């Protein structure tokens, strides 16, 4: 048996005798990766704690997750939540938001004002990435989505153009980018043909960032060489990137779209999620 829940935030109930800087009652968000070496491995020393040796996550390879009243964690994973926010406001930032922020941060390093960034999928991660991109760069944001409802919801968050997936989406993106494709394409879906679609939307010398997963990425080596496109994988962000994301949230530059459920309604939340009834992220409140 396992208690699920790896996106966690809450109030400190108790601290160990050696803990400094945190006390009972502090509101905190938890970075989801717990280092198996207490932060002494080379990856952690380099600030790449996402790739910590023997790393583990609550609710996955640690059996005690966040679908509970209490959760034990390491002080290394804690970040204090700004006073303008509450744990329920930010809990999904600890993975979904952090992943979206990380890929947006990667993309904005190379996006110049007036260039183009496509986001495929405007759901739980996509709607956060749109806001991060808008806050961090002046590129044109093109949202590609199969759901007309989701597209309408996402556009006010920072979209410059919206493209509905109807079989002509690649051609539409090409029209919006003067026939060249986008300098950056962020694929939040990673299945049902989105990888091929995303690569076809990517400009020569551009970058295709894959976040969602489910299918193989198929491209001939000669096409990679001739186009000089980059394919970049994306995992959860680091502790420092979660801190940066909290700063964006504190400035009200990134907000979560969420539905609240009581902890006792966890099964209903999972049922609604499975049936596509959740807009944004579902949050359990003890």
Regions found by a protein language model. Give the residues of each.
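Glycine-rich beta-strand-centered segment in the early N-terminal region that forms part
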Residues: 1-42, 82-85
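Residue-level marker of beta-strand positions
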Residues: 7-9, 27, 43, 70, ...
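Cysteine-cluster motifs in flexible loop/terminal segments that predominantly coordinate metals
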Residues: 21, 32-79, 83
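Mid-domain Rossmann-like dinucleotide-binding core that forms the NAD(H)/NADP(H) cofactor-binding site
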Residues: 76-78, 83-167, 171-172
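Glycine-rich cofactor phosphate-binding loops and adjacent beta1-alpha1 units
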Residues: 108-113, 136, 151-230
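C-terminal hydrophobic helical "lid"/dimerization subdomain
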Residues: 143, 148, 196-200, 239-286
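Rossmann-fold dehydrogenase core element
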Residues: 207-209, 219-259
């Amino acid at each position: 048996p396992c208690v699920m829940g790896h996106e966690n935030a809450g109030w400190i109930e108790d601290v160990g005798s050696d803990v400094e800087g945190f006390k009972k009652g502090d509101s905190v968000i938890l970075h989801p990766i717990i280092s198996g070496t207490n932060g002494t491995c080379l990856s952690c020393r380099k600030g790449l704690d996402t790739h910590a040796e023997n790393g583990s996550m609550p609710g996955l390879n640690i059996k005690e997750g966040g679908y509970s009243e209490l959760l034990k964690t390491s002080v290394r994973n804690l970040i204090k939540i700004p006073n303008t926010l509450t744990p329920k406001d930010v809990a999904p930032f600890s993975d979904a938001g952090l992943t979206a922020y990380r890929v947006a941060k990667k993309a904005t390093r190379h996006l110049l004002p007036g260039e183009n960034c496509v986001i495929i999928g405007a759901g739980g991660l996509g709607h956060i990435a749109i806001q991060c991109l808008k806050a961090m760069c002046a590129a044109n944001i093109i949202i590609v989505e199969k759901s007309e409802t989701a597209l309408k919801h996402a556009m006010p968050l920072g979209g410059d153009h919206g493209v509905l997936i109807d079989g002509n989406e690649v051609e539409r993106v090409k029209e919006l980018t003067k026939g060249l494709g986008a300098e950056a394409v962020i694929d939040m879906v990673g299945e049902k043909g989105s990888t091929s679609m995303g690569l076809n939307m990517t400009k020569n010398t551009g970058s295709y960032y894959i976040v969602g997963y489910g299918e193989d990425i198929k491209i001939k080596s000669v096409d990679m060489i001739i186009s000089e496109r980059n394919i970049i994988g994306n995992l959860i962000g680091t502790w420092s990137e979660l801190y940066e994301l909290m700063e964006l949230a504190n400035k009200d530059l990134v907000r979560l779209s969420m539905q609240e459920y009581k902890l006792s309604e966890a099964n209903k939340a999972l049922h609604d999620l499975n049936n596509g009834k959740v807009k944004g992220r579902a949050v359990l409140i003890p």
